[in-house]
Regions:
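Basic, low-complexity intrinsically disordered segments
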Residues: 1-563
Length: 563
């Protein structure tokens, strides 16, 4: 459900940058012959030519759509170039596109807080950069940057095509603008500067939305594509939302949006204005009702998270129609490949970024034989993540078996799996320093052995309530050794101070792991996938913690400084 967050008192400048048919651009950079040609990137699948996942604007002009498959696209546009995504382990390998996206992120992050939302889209909080520009007299911005900013689409600014740039320049330069609009104008110039840099340094074009919050910036970033940007002044918000279809709003594309249409007769966001906050709360609960009331007014307090790295790693594969998996052997074969890729990615994250993932989750889509219309879904299953390809493969299969047993409800019937995915989540940074890492892994000493999570137990982390933790694979590895029992007995004495207990604990771990010296040794220790690592983290509760502008700009726009 959506969360109603309070909006900051100070005005913000938020941008949503969206790459233009990014996969196609990456392939065009690899093979410049494709530039200007109708091109589409197809997913790994030879059925009917494969599914289209990106379509160039040249191909769209012929009527090619992403919902088509390769064979249909060729019928619509015989001259289309179909480029297949790279393949690894029998499935699409997106590392080429992830790497290209990282090039773009490195540039965009130079101007403020940057949140990487996906391979090809980013949120930016440019508030500080806009304020700094507003205080400059004159600011340092070349004419070509201002020219790019002057091409912006300003919502609510009426002008014919011939007068557009002139009117946008006037809007950017106007001396009577309020503080919020002046910040937005600076944001438009900063985004234009970043987009020019991205094009020069990567050969990629991108579009952007600039507004006072993430919700509005996201909504308008795709309004004028390709290679354009759109600005939403506060004075234009209501008119913009008045005609926006409910299903176009994030969080309203599913059941909640359908409920608004069916129960309240709401078809556009503007229609929500006729309902009081109390009425919406009565219908949908306090939190959701408040969120709907604020959304109708363009209010959103969601902040840009300063995150350049993904919050999770996932690998998946679909098996449509006759490709569905119908026995455990075929499921295991594909799970092993998915887990191998996942293991490589989390190991790379560990080595390069010093981050550890805590939770392994398995998702699947399934159907029972002769029950094609069944509404029961295959349950997602989670367990503490153990590093090492073999361990991940073993645990993932156990998760699948647990989910299948629950899905079938003890019925002796056939089944089909049409989608499989494994995800590593709950990622945290490793604290610097060997002793800190040891403390973080082990936590405070306990006289009791680690508890064994059962499939019926409720996860301690509220965000994992929809998942079920299954019993660890090797229960015997959870039992304390003789030396551990002795230490636990010793530590139970109340006369030992907390400081002394911590010293004894680190000494005990050091004896057990004499090779651990510095962070690199710890990384090696973790990569070996010691069973005590994930079990002790779970038992200790660690799973849930954790440049000049044109003269008019200089004279008029910056004539009155703001503090």
């Amino acid at each position: 459900m959506p969360v109603a967050r309070p909006e900051p008192q100070e005005p913000r400048v938020i941008a949503h940058v969206d790459m233009d048919c990014f996969y196609v651009q990456v392939e065009q950079r690899r093979n410049p012959v494709l530039r200007g040609q109708p091109t589409a990137v197809v997913q790994y699948n030879d059925w009917k030519g494969g599914g289209l996942i990106a379509v160039s604007y040249e191909a769209r002009g012929f009527g090619v759509k992403r919902s088509m498959r390769g064979d249909e696209a060729k019928r619509v546009c015989p001259g289309i170039n179909l480029v297949q995504v790279p393949v690894a382990r029998g499935k699409a390998d997106l590392n080429l596109y992830r790497s290209a996206g990282s090039e773009v992120v490195a540039i965009l992050a130079s101007k403020g807080k940057c949140e990487r939302a996906s391979i090809d889209e980013v949120y930016l909080d440019l508030t500080d950069a806009a304020k700094e520009m507003l205080l400059q007299a004159p600011p340092d911005s070349p004419e070509e940057i201002f020219m790019e900013a002057a091409k912006s689409n300003i919502l609510g600014l009426l002008s014919d095509a011939g007068e557009k740039e002139k009117n946008v320049r006037a809007w950017l330069c106007r001396s009577d603008a309020d503080y919020q609009d002046k910040l937005l104008a600076c944001g438009a110039i900063i985004v234009a500067q970043l987009r020019v840099r991205v094009l020069e340094e990567t050969q990629f074009t991108c579009s952007a939305g600039i507004a006072h919050n993430k919700m509005l910036a996201k909504l308008v970033s795709g309004m004028h594509k390709p290679a354009q940007q759109t600005v939403v002044p506060s004075s234009s918000v209501q008119d913009f939302l008045a005609s926006l279809p409910v299903k176009k709003m994030k969080q309203l594309g599913g059941k909640l949006g359908s409920s608004l249409q069916d129960d309240l007769g709401v078809e556009t966001i503007g229609d929500l204005l006729s309902f009081t906050e109390d009425k919406l709360q009565e219908q949908y609960g306090v939190n959701t009702g408040t969120w709907l009331w604020k959304t109708a007014r363009g209010i959103s307090g969601e902040e840009v998270e300063d995150r350049l790295l993904p919050k999770s790693h996932g690998c998946g594969k679909t098996f449509p129609g006759p490709r569905a998996l119908k026995n455990s052997a075929s499921v295991k074969g594909w799970l092993d490949q998915l887990c191998e890729e996942l293991s490589e990615r989390i190991q790379s994250d560990l080595n390069q970024n010093k981050r550890i993932a805590q939770t392994l989750t398995l998702h699947a889509r399934a159907s029972k034989e002769n029950e094609r219309d069944s509404t029961k879904k295959f349950p997602s299953k989670s367990c503490p993540l153990r590093y090492g390809t073999g361990k991940i493969q073993e645990d993932a299969m156990k998760l699948f078996e647990s989910g299948l047993h629950e899905f079938l409800e003890s019925q002796n019937t056939g089944w089909s799996i049409t989608s499989l995915s494994v995800t590593a989540s709950k990622i945290f940074d490793i604290p610097s320093g060997t002793s800190s890492i040891l403390r973080y892994i082990k936590g405070p000493s306990s006289a009791a052995p680690p508890a064994i999570p059962d499939s019926s137990s409720v996860p301690e982390d509220p965000s994992l309530d929809n998942d079920v933790f299954v019993k660890p694979i090797h229960e015997e590895q959870c039992q304390p050794s003789m030396s551990e029992k002795e230490d636990n007995n010793a530590h139970s004495a109340s006369a030992i101070s907390a400081k002394q207990r911590q010293a004894n604990e680190e000494k005990r771990i050091s004896k057990k792991l004499p090779e651990v010296k510095g962070t690199s040794s710890i990384l090696k220790f973790l990569s070996r996938g010691q069973s005590t690592f994930h079990e002790k983290r779970k038992s200790d509760g660690l799973i849930c913690s954790h440049q000049g502008l044109v003269d008019c700009m200089s004279r008029e726009f910056f004539g009155s400084k703001q503090s």
